[in-house]
Swiss-Prot record:
NCBIfam families: L18_bact. The gene is rplR. Gene3D superfamilies: 3.30.420.100. This is one of the proteins that bind and probably mediate the attachment of the 5S RNA into the large ribosomal subunit, where it forms part of the central protuberance. This is Large ribosomal subunit protein uL18. It comes from Chlamydia trachomatis serovar D (strain ATCC VR-885 / DSM 19411 / UW-3/Cx). The lineage of its organism: Bacteria, Pseudomonadati, Chlamydiota, Chlamydiia, Chlamydiales. Pfam families: Ribosomal_L18p (PF00861). GO terms for biological process: translation. It comes from the Bacteria. GO terms for cellular component: cytosolic large ribosomal subunit. HAMAP family: Ribosomal_uL18_B (MF_01337_B). InterPro entries: Ribosomal_uL18_bac-type, Ribosomal_uL18_bac/euk.
Length: 123
């Protein structure tokens, strides 16, 4: 008999794998990955060919803390999207592949995407 926690975590891993198997990021068009926990949001630009993270920001980062973006809500998620777009522009990245992970494109995840679009990234 499987525990309910095992079902939940394995289902989440399967959903994330299903989304990620269709996505591939490179240095010219990296993967914009959004990870959401109960308290925080993490956003990364990832080059899958090299296996490297090009840029990252979260609600735990010093830049976010000085800006007052320490909580997981939609306003802060949009601001994180704008900031990751600025970091991407510094790396000459203007196109990305959006990776929502195991989460629905809704709420905080959608606001990160909207903020990144506002900041100048194209999906």
């Amino acid at each position: 008999m499987e525990s309910s926690l095992y079902k939940k975590t394995s289902g989440k891993a399967r959903r994330a794998l299903r989304v990620r198997k269709a996505l591939k990021g490179c240095s010219l068009k990296p993967r914009l990955s959004v990870v959401k926990t109960n308290k925080h949001v993490y956003v990364q630009l990832i080059d899958d060919v090299e296996g490297k993270t090009l840029a990252s920001i979260s609600t735990l980062a010093k830049v976010a803390k000085t800006s007052g973006l320490t909580r997981k809500n939609q306003d802060n998620a949009k601001a994180l999207g704008i900031k990751i777009a600025e970091l991407g522009k510094g790396l000459q990245v203007d196109r990305v592949v959006f990776d929502r992970g195991a989460h629905k494109y809704h709420g905080v995840v959608a606001m990160v995407a909207d903020g990144a679009r506002e900041g100048g990234l194209q999906f």
